[in-house]
């Protein structure tokens, strides 16, 4: 069996949220009061349950798993969990999305456990502005985490910058320069109308064509389109000639990437979300806790792919996604 949706897209990438809790409160991701302020830890899948679902997906052809949150490093035992799933035959890569606040403490253990690489959310290089965007974040701590990750061999590390008009759009060029200095990829991301947090910031939407025009003006003819197969999915990537740096752009709103979608998302509470921008989902926690067999679980996952929608409707109707929070989906 393989995972094929109704539009003949092969699903080979699973994003797994291990928690919807986060030590930051970025405005486009999480409401100020938190996503589930009254949520119980018993609602979370435990690591054995998560591992069992991941094994089923890998047996069905998934080759890449990304660990997300919330902030995954606030959940204890993450290196051990990665070590548990790393040997699965057919799993080629385990990646992490993090705010890097705790990465300096865990980078070596994560690499030893089998983590391949990390994406770091960093929306400003100015400490006060960074603190404001994240509602309390510490830029110095994050950059120390980045350095620790690079030193541990988590390579490549990618920076994800959500560009917001009037908030941090004045730092596009500075972020490019920092990427060149560190030899990392910087990915610029449009704001997306997901959940009350994301919808509330759509007046700060900064379109991708403006971002790329400024990047091109800054680096000139040294921006070269990247070629070759990649798991980067929606990111359009460019090399900067003469450096180890790359630029990536994710234009979920102005130029959607649905025709090549190869991923689904598993939330920490056991919901299999089939589209980032629609409510289509399947509950896996209940059958797991009721003792479903491995083969029946695989068949349930195969059947779930038949419910995957063709595309999102970010440009047409934001209201169909206001009840989800980005922090629960893991991006």
Swiss-Prot record:
Which reaction does this chain catalyze? GTP + AH2 + S-adenosyl-L-methionine = (8S)-3',8-cyclo-7,8-dihydroguanosine 5'-triphosphate + 5'-deoxyadenosine + L-methionine + A + H(+)
Which residues are involved in binding [4Fe-4S] cluster 1? 22, 26, 29
Keyword DNA repair present in the record's keywords: the answer is no
Q: Which Pfam families match?
A: Mob_synth_C (PF06463), Radical_SAM (PF04055)
Residues that coordinate or bind GTP: 15, 66, 97, 158, 263-265
Q: Where does S-adenosyl-L-methionine bind?
A: 28, 70, 121, 192
The protein's matches in InterPro entries, at most eight in alphabetical order, are given as:
Aldolase_TIM (IPR013785), Elp3/MiaA/NifB-like_rSAM (IPR006638), MoaA (IPR013483), MoaA_twitch (IPR010505), MoCo_biosynth_MoaA/MoaC (IPR050105), rSAM (IPR007197)
Query: Among its keywords, does the record have Glycoprotein?
Result: no
**Example GO BP:** Mo-molybdopterin cofactor biosynthetic process
What residue stretches are annotated with the Radical SAM core domain? 6-234
**Which superkingdom heads the taxonomic lineage of this protein's source?**
Bacteria
The parts of the chain that form a coiled coil are none
Q: Name the Gene Ontology molecular function terms of this record.
A: 4 iron, 4 sulfur cluster binding; cyclic pyranopterin monophosphate synthase activity; GTP 3',8'-cyclase activity; GTP binding; metal ion binding; S-adenosyl-L-methionine binding
Among CDD domains, the record links this protein to: Radical_SAM, Twitch_MoaA
Q: What pathway annotation does it carry?
A: Cofactor biosynthesis; molybdopterin biosynthesis
Q: Using the UniProt record, name the top-level EC class of this enzyme in a single word.
A: lyase
Where would you find the membrane-spanning parts of this chain? Answer: none
Q: Where along this sequence does the record place binding of [4Fe-4S] cluster 2?
A: 258, 261, 275
Instruction: Enumerate the UniProt keywords alphabetically.
Output: 4Fe-4S, GTP-binding, Iron, Iron-sulfur, Lyase, Metal-binding, Molybdenum cofactor biosynthesis, Nucleotide-binding, S-adenosyl-L-methionine
Names of required cofactors: [4Fe-4S] cluster
User: What Enzyme Commission number(s) does the record list for this chain?
Assistant: 4.1.99.22
Q: How is the cofactor bound?
A: Binds 2 [4Fe-4S] clusters. Binds 1 [4Fe-4S] cluster coordinated with 3 cysteines and an exchangeable S-adenosyl-L-methionine and 1 [4Fe-4S] cluster coordinated with 3 cysteines and the GTP-derived substrate.
Q: Which family does it belong to?
A: Belongs to the radical SAM superfamily. MoaA family.
The subunit field of the Swiss-Prot or TrEMBL record says:
Monomer and homodimer.
Q: Tell me, what does this protein do in biology?
A: Catalyzes the cyclization of GTP to (8S)-3',8-cyclo-7,8-dihydroguanosine 5'-triphosphate.
- State the protein's name: GTP 3',8-cyclase
The opening ranks of the lineage are: Bacteria, Pseudomonadati, Pseudomonadota, Gammaproteobacteria, Thiotrichales
């Amino acid at each position: 069996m393989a995972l094929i949706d109704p539009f003949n897209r092969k699903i080979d990438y699973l994003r797994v949220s291990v928690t919807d809790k986060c030590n930051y409160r970025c405005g486009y991701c999480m409401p100020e009061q938190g996503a589930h302020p009254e949520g119980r830890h018993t609602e979370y899948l435990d690591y054995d349950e998560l591992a069992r679902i991941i094994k089923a997906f890998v047996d069905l052809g998934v080759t890449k798993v990304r660990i997300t949150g919330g902030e995954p490093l606030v959940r204890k035992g993450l290196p051990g969990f990665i070590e548990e799933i790393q040997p699965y035959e057919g799993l080629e890569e385990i990646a992490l999305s993090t705010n890097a606040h705790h990465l300096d403490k865990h980078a070596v253990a994560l690499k030893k456990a089998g983590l391949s690489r990390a994406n770091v959310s960093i929306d400003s290089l100015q400490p006060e502005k960074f603190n404001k965007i994240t509602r309390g974040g510490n830029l110095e701590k994050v950059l120390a985490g980045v350095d620790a990750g690079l030193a541990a061999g988590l390579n490549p590390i990618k920076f994800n910058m959500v560009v917001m008009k009037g908030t941090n759009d004045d730092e596009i060029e500075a972020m490019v320069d920092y990427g060149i200095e560190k030899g990392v990829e910087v990915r610029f991301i449009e704001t997306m109308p997901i959940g009350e947090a994301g919808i509330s910031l759509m007046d700060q939407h900064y379109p991708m064509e403006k971002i790329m025009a400024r990047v091109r003006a800054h680096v000139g003819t040294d921006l070269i389109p990247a070629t070759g197969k990649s798991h980067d999915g929606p990111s359009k990537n460019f090399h900067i000639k003469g450096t180890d740096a790359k630029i990536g752009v994710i234009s979920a709103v102005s130029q959607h990437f649905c025709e090549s979608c190869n991923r689904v998302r598993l939330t920490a509470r056991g919901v299999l979300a089939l589209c980032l921008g629609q409510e289509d989902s399947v509950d896996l926690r209940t059958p797991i806790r009721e003792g479903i067999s491995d083969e029946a679980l695989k068949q349930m996952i195969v059947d779930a792919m038949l419910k995957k929608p063709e595309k999102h409707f970010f440009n047409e109707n934001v209201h169909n996604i206001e009840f989800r929070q980005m922090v629960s989906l893991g991006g």
